[in-house]
Amino acid sequence: MFKEMNLNLKQMGNMIYEDPTRIQEEEDIVQEVSTTFSDEEDNSSSCSLSSSMCSDFTEDDDDDDVSSSSSNGPLEDLSDLMSHLPIKRGLSKFYEGKSQSFTSLGNVKSLEDLMKRGFKSRNYGAKRKSSRSTGGILDQSYKRVFSPKATISKKPNRTPSSVLSCLARRRH
C-alpha cells in the first residue's frame, strides 16, 4: 500500500515540478516517510520519527507504564474496573452514600434509623402544606410591594402646526 502511495506521489511530483533537484528532494522525503511507516508497522513503538523526541517522551511516561502494566489485559469485571479507579474524596471521609439530615453520624444507632430518617426527610407533602399556609400572606404582601403602581400621566398637548405658526407670527 505504501509503495503505491510512493509511486503516486512521485508521479505527481514529476508532473508538477520540472526541477531535478526539487524532484530529488521530494523523492528523499517520500522515502523517509515510507521507511518511517514501515518501521512503525514492524515496531510496536510509535516513536520512530525522531529519536530525540522519542527518548524525551518515553522517559516521562515510564512511571505511567509501570502502574498501567499491573493489569492483566482488558478490564472485563466491574470489580477490576473499580480497583483501577481513583478513590473519590468528598467532604466526609467516614460516610459513603446519600447525605442524610443527621447532624452527626454518631447519632445513628442502626440502619433502621437511617431508613426512617431518610423517608421522613423525603416527606415533601408536609413541607408543601406548611408553605401554602403562610404563602398566601407572603404573596399578598409581595404583590403590594412589588406590583407596578397605577400612574396618571399627562398627555402632551398637541397643537396643530397652523396654530403654532400663527402664534409665532404674532410675536414678531
UniProtKB/Swiss-Prot annotation:
Observed effect of gene inactivation: Abolished ability to confer tolerance to stress (e.g. metals and oxidizing chemicals such as Cd, As, Cu, diamide or tert-butyl hydroperoxide (t-BOOH)). Early flowering under mild drought stress treatment.
Region (Disordered): 34-79, 148-172
Motif Nuclear localization signal 2: positions: 142-149
Record's keyword annotation contains Nucleus: yes
Effect of L91A: Abolished ability to confer tolerance to stress (e.g. metals and oxidizing chemicals such as Cd, As, Cu, diamide or t-BOOH)
Low complexity composition bias: residue spans: 44-56
Result for mutant: R89A: Abolished ability to confer tolerance to stress (e.g. metals and oxidizing chemicals such as Cd, As, Cu, diamide or t-BOOH)
GO terms, biological process: regulation of photoperiodism, flowering; regulation of response to water deprivation; response to cadmium ion; response to copper ion; response to far red light; response to light stimulus; response to oxidative stress; response to red light
Annotated keywords: Nucleus, Stress response
Tissues expressing the protein: Mostly expressed in stems, shoots and leaves, and, to a lower extent, in siliques and seedlings. Barely detectable in roots.
Annotated compartments: Nucleus; Nucleus speckle
Motif placement: Nuclear localization signal 1: 115-122
UniProt protein name: Protein OXIDATIVE STRESS 3
Species lineage: Eukaryota, Viridiplantae, Streptophyta, Embryophyta, Tracheophyta
